[in-house]
C-alpha cells in the first residue's frame, strides 16, 4: 500500500518509477488520482451534509420553542434531505475508497534509482563471481545421479516416479543418504545463520490467512502462484510470509532493531507460469524446503546496509560448501513485485554449463510494513514510523542439494560429501 498523499503530491515520481519496471503501469497514476478525487469529493459532500443536518437539528428546537410549526417542518425536511445526502455520499465514499485501496494493493514497489533499467533477466548486471567451476568430463545432471544411487530394496534415492504416483508432477521422494544429505544441508545452514550471523531461529506456521499474504505482497496479484487450502488459509510459498508477519500490527522500540529471523520450512508454489520449464529434476518443484532470512530495520540507509550483510550471509553458505557462484544485481523488469533492490545468487551447475538461481535477497523499504501496519518509535515518545523489511534465501535447500550432487559427482556415479557437511553426515564422506 502506498501513501496516497505522496502520490497526490508527486505523481510524476510514481509514474516514472512504474514505467522503469517495464510493467505498463505508468498510466495507472491517472486512475489513482481520479479515484482519489472521487473519494475526497464524496467525503466533503458527506461532511457538508452532516454539518447541515446538525445545524438544522438545533434550529428545529428553537422553531418549536417559538411555536413556529411551519419553520420547524421546513427544517425537518432539510434534516431528512441531509440524512439522505449523507447516506448517498457515504456509499460513494466507501466505494471510491475500496476501489482506490484495491488498486493500490495490487501495485508493485518502486525500484531504487540505482537499480539498472531492463525488461527481463538479460538486463541483470553481474557484481562478482566466486570460485572456479570444476572441470568434469561428461557431467551428469542431478536427476540422473540421484536415480542411479540406490537405497533399500534397490529403489532410487531420488525417486520421482514414486512421488508422481501419490502427488503428480514436480514432486520428489528422497531416500537414505540423500535424505540425510538434505537434512544435513538445512542444519548446516541454520547453524551458520544462528551461531555466526546473529539470526534468531523461529518455528512458524506454514498455513496463513489472507491478510498475511496481503501483508507481504503475494496477494492480491499472485494468487494463481499459491496453493489455497480453505476459504481463509493458504500454504506459504516462502517462510518470508510468516517471518515478516511476526511484526504485523506492532509498534517496536528503536532499541529492538534490527530484528533478524530465520526458519527452515517447506514451501509450496503452483508454478503456474512455468509450463515446460525445468520439468525434469528438483530445480522447480511444487514443494521444496528452504532456509529463509528476514530482517526488520529502521530506515533506508540501514536497509541498504542490511541487504549487503544479508547477501553476504547467504554467500557464506556457498563458500563453505565450496560451490562456485556469482552475484547478480537484478534489473527493474526482473525484480519481484515487493522489492526495491534485489541481488540473486546463482550457483554453477555443470550439467547445464551455466549458473542457476539459488538465492534471492531483497530490500523492500516500507512497502510491506505499510500493508502490515508494522511500525517503530525512533524515540520513546516519538510518533511511530514504518519499519523497513528485507528477505532472502539462506539457501533453497533443494537447489543446494542439486548443486552438491552435480559439483561433487565422481566418475563412478558416487558423490563426495563437502567437508563442511561431513560432521552433519555422521562422518560419511562418500554417498554411493
Swiss-Prot record:
Pathway the protein takes part in: Aminoacyl-tRNA biosynthesis; selenocysteinyl-tRNA(Sec) biosynthesis; L-seryl-tRNA(Sec) from L-serine and tRNA(Sec): step 1/1
Annotated compartments: Cytoplasm
ATP-binding found in the keyword field: yes
Reactions catalysed: tRNA(Ser) + L-serine + ATP = L-seryl-tRNA(Ser) + AMP + diphosphate + H(+); tRNA(Sec) + L-serine + ATP = L-seryl-tRNA(Sec) + AMP + diphosphate + H(+)
Assigned EC number: 6.1.1.11
Molecular function GO terms recorded: ATP binding; serine-tRNA ligase activity
Residue numbers binding ATP: 269-271, 357-360
GO CC aspect terms: cytoplasm
Superkingdom as given in the UniProt entry: Bacteria
Keywords, in A-Z order: Aminoacyl-tRNA synthetase, ATP-binding, Cytoplasm, Ligase, Nucleotide-binding, Protein biosynthesis
GO biological processes: selenocysteine biosynthetic process; seryl-tRNA aminoacylation
Binding site residues for L-serine: 238-240, 292, 393
Family: Belongs to the class-II aminoacyl-tRNA synthetase family. Type-1 seryl-tRNA synthetase subfamily.
Quaternary structure and partners: Homodimer. The tRNA molecule binds across the dimer.
Domain remark in the UniProt entry: Consists of two distinct domains, a catalytic core and a N-terminal extension that is involved in tRNA binding.
General function of this protein: Catalyzes the attachment of serine to tRNA(Ser). Is also able to aminoacylate tRNA(Sec) with serine, to form the misacylated tRNA L-seryl-tRNA(Sec), which will be further converted into selenocysteinyl-tRNA(Sec).
Name of protein: Serine--tRNA ligase
Lineage: Bacteria, Pseudomonadati, Pseudomonadota, Alphaproteobacteria, Hyphomonadales
Gene name of the record: serS
Amino acid at each position: 500500500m502506498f501513501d496516497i498523499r505522496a502520490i497526490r503530491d508527486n505523481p510524476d515520481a510514481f509514474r516514472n518509477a512504474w514505467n522503469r519496471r517495464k510493467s505498463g503501469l505508468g498510466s495507472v497514476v491517472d486512475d489513482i488520482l481520479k479515484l482519489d478525487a472521487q473519494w475526497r469529493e464524496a467525503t466533503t459532500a458527506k461532511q457538508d451534509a452532516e454539518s447541515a443536518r446538525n445545524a438544522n437539528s438545533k434550529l428545529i428546537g428553537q422553531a418549536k420553542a417559538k411555536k413556529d410549526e411551519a419553520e420547524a417542518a421546513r427544517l425537518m425536511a432539510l434534516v431528512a434531505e441531509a440524512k439522505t445526502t449523507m447516506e448517498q455520499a457515504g456509499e460513494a465514499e466507501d466505494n471510491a475508497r475500496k476501489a482506490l485501496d484495491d488498486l493500490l494493493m495490487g501495485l508493485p514497489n518502486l525500484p531504487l534509482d540505482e537499480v539498472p533499467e531492463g525488461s527481463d533477466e538479460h538486463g541483470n548486471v553481474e557484481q562478482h563471481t566466486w570460485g572456479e567451476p570444476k572441470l568434469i568430463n561428461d557431467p551428469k545432471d542431478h536427476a540422473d545421479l540421484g536415480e542411479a544411487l540406490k537405497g533399500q530394496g534397490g529403489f532410487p534415492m531420488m525417486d520421482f516416479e514414486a512421488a508422481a504416483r501419490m502427488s503428480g508432477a514436480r514432486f520428489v521422494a528422497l531416500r537414505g543418504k540423500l535424505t540425510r544429505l538434505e537434512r544435513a544441508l538445512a542444519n548446516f545452514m541454520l547453524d551458520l545463520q544462528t551461531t555466526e550471523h546473529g539470526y534468531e531461529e523461529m518455528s512458524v506456521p506454514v498455513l496463513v490467512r489472507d491478510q498475511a499474504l496481503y501483508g507481504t505482497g503475494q496477494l492480491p496479484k499472485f494468487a494463481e502462484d499459491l496453493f489455497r487450502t480453505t476459504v481463509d488459509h493458504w500454504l506459504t510459498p516462502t517462510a518470508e510470509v510468516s517471518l515478516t508477519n511476526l511484526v504485523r500490527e506492532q509498534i517496536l522500540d528503536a532499541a529492538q532493531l534490527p530484528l533478524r529471523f530465520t526458519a527452515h520450512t517447506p514451501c509450496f508454489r503452483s508454478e503456474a507460469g512455468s509450463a515446460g520449464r525445468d520439468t525434469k529434476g528438483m530445480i522447480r518443484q511444487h514443494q521444496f524446503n528452504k532456509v529463509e532470512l528476514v530482517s526488520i530495520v529502521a530506515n533506508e540507509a540501514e536497509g541498504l546496509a542490511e541487504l549487503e550483510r544479508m547477501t553476504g550471509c547467504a554467500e557464506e553458505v556457498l563458500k563453505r560448501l565450496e560451490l562456485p557462484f556469482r552475484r547478480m544485481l537484478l534489473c527493474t523488469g526482473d525484480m519481484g513485485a515487493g522489492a526495491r533492490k534485489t541481488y540473486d545468487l546463482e550457483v554453477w551447475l555443470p550439467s547445464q554449463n551455466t549458473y542457476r538461481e539459488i538465492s534471492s535477497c531483497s530490500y523492500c523499504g516500507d512497502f510491506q510494513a505499510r500493508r502490515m501496519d508494522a511500525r517503530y518509535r525512533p524515540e520513546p515518545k516519538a510518533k511511530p514510523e514504518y519499519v523497513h523489511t528485507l528477505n532472502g534465501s539462506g539457501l533453497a535447500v533443494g537447489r543446494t542439494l542439486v548443486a552438491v550432487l552435480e559439483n561433487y559427482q565422481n566418475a563412478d556415479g558416487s558423490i563426495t560429501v563437502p567437508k563442511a557437511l561431513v560432521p552433519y553426515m555422521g562422518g560419511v564422506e562418500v554417498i554411493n
